[in-house]
Amino acid sequence: MKVGIVGSGFVGSATAYALVLQGVAREVVLVDLDRKLAQAHAEDILHATPFAHPVWVRSGWYEDLEGARVVIVAAGVAQRPGETRLQLLDRNAQVFADVVPKILKAAPEAVLLIATNPVDVMTQVAYRLSGLPPERVVGSGTILDTARFRALLAQHLLVAPQSVHAYVVGEHGDSEVLVWSSAQVGGVDLEAFAQARGRALTPDDRLRIDEGVRRAAYRIIEGKGATYYGIGAGLARLTRAILTDEKGVFTVSLFTPEVEGVEEVALSLPRILGARGVEATLYPRLNEEERQALRRSAEILKGAASALGF
């Protein structure tokens, strides 16, 4: 099973490393405009395989993506001093206009897994450029935000995070929506579980957890310049779900016909992920406040994509 990664920077290389550690693929091909960078990362990661799983890691060019079942797109440009978000979006859209056709020429049957930020808008750009069915252009979305939410809830409740079922939906960014109202632990509603555990969730606790999820990327970027290990592991997890036709539920971003009255927008909702990409979208139970917040998030994303002409 071959996986391609276009863009060998922090996120692309961390994803390749996670694929090796998790033993997800049998072959990983790194493609980057900076061929020396791709080659260096491929060689370095290959040397980890004796300690992990037998994965053939190599660098290549677009034609080497032939036969890939998943292509992870982590290509993009860094924000310049004084550059607006919309200007950055426009430059990244230009990058996608170059790379997406090249990917599909080599691997027309692949599922595209979008990692470039802002990921929701870039997922919509990739979908429009590709001409693929929307279910085959999947953004990493709020998988990391959802993981952070579950981890912080688990920490407060003194329970394993794997037993926490809670979602973050909408934008992967400032307008994301933490769905408190339908969160559960072990099949028990969150509030009831917290009371039974003697770990009540006060308004201050909720605010602390919300800030912990919503501001995590800012704290990490302030400390070391970028986030990559968490999203690299998350992208490897999504790749495994696709390659194994797992049909697991993940909060990934997808071009969606309508969300809370906002038409044609890419954002995150819980979705079933399998061999051909997204198989179904699940709408979690939301209270009125969460519904309004999701609508605002959708409007923000719709506006950004529309400003780019996508």
UniProtKB/Swiss-Prot annotation:
Q: Cite the pH-dependence comment.
A: Optimum pH is 5 and 6.7 with citrate and fructose 1,6-bisphosphate (FBP) as activator, respectively.
Q: Which residues cross the membrane?
A: none
Q: Which residues carry this modification: Phosphotyrosine?
A: Y218
Superkingdom of origin: Bacteria
Q: Could you tell me which Gene3D superfamilies the record lists for this protein?
A: Lactate dehydrogenase/glycoside hydrolase, family 4, C-terminal, NAD(P)-binding Rossmann-like Domain
Q: Which reaction does it catalyse?
A: (S)-lactate + NAD(+) = pyruvate + NADH + H(+)
Documented activity regulation? Activated by citrate at pH 5. Allosterically activated by fructose 1,6-bisphosphate (FBP) at pH from 5.8 to 7.2.
* GO BP: any one term: lactate metabolic process
EC class: oxidoreductase
The entry's function note states: Catalyzes the conversion of lactate to pyruvate.
Family, similarity comment: Belongs to the LDH/MDH superfamily. LDH family.
Q: What is known about its subunit structure? A: Homotetramer.
Can you say what this protein is called? L-lactate dehydrogenase
**What gene is this protein translated from?**
ldh
